[in-house]
Regions:
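A SIS-like phosphosugar-recognition module
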Residues: 1-167
Length: 167
């Protein structure tokens, strides 16, 4: 399929555009500043489908280089695990695409109702999400941009906590 091949060819440009996008960098820094300001030590990253694996990679990177407790969960298992731990000292990062938005809108409302800090990493702009980082939509292979953005958040968090991310 030409669309799949063209999307694959466009990945280097999409990654470059992502990393050089000032708005994305500002929103990542805002998230990091909130974590630091609120002295948050727990983070849950929720994804579904392919983005569950992305959530696991993001949680691992955050733990490894910023020393913040981060766990990944399938968005569908929220009520079977971390839901009981949600409070205003926790941050939840939802990974939302056009493919899973219907399911995750209700999850977003459930999290917000618990007075939990909820941020959305997404490739679609929906007004319903208050705090969001919008990354480019590249049709296929979007999980690559989600992983890189989570790595950027982990790196920025590490630097803000004065931790050398290369150790």
């Amino acid at each position: 399929n030409n669309l799949v091949i063209n999307s694959l060819r466009n990945i280097p440009n999409a990654v470059s555009n992502l990393l050089n996008n000032n708005l994305i960098n500002v929103h990542c820094q805002f998230l990091v500043d909130e974590i630091k300001r609120k002295n948050i030590e727990n983070m849950f990253i929720l994804g579904s489908g392919k983005l569950f694996s992305v959530a696991k990679e993001g949680a691992l990177k955050i733990k490894e280089i910023s020393y913040i407790h981060a766990e990944a969960y399938s968005a569908g298992s929220l009520k079977h695990g971390p839901f009981a731990l949600l409070d205003n000292k926790t941050i939840v990062l939802l990974l939302v695409t056009s493919n899973n938005k219907e399911k995750l809108i209700s999850t977003y409302h459930e999290i917000s109702a618990r007075n939990t800090n909820c941020y959305v990493l997404t490739d679609i702009d929906l007004d319903i999400f208050k705090n969001k980082i919008i990354i480019p939509n590249i049709n296929y292979y979007e999980e690559i941009l989600f992983v890189i953005t989570l790595q950027l958040i982990a790196y920025t968090l590490s630097i803000s906590r004065e931790i050398n991310p290369d150790k």
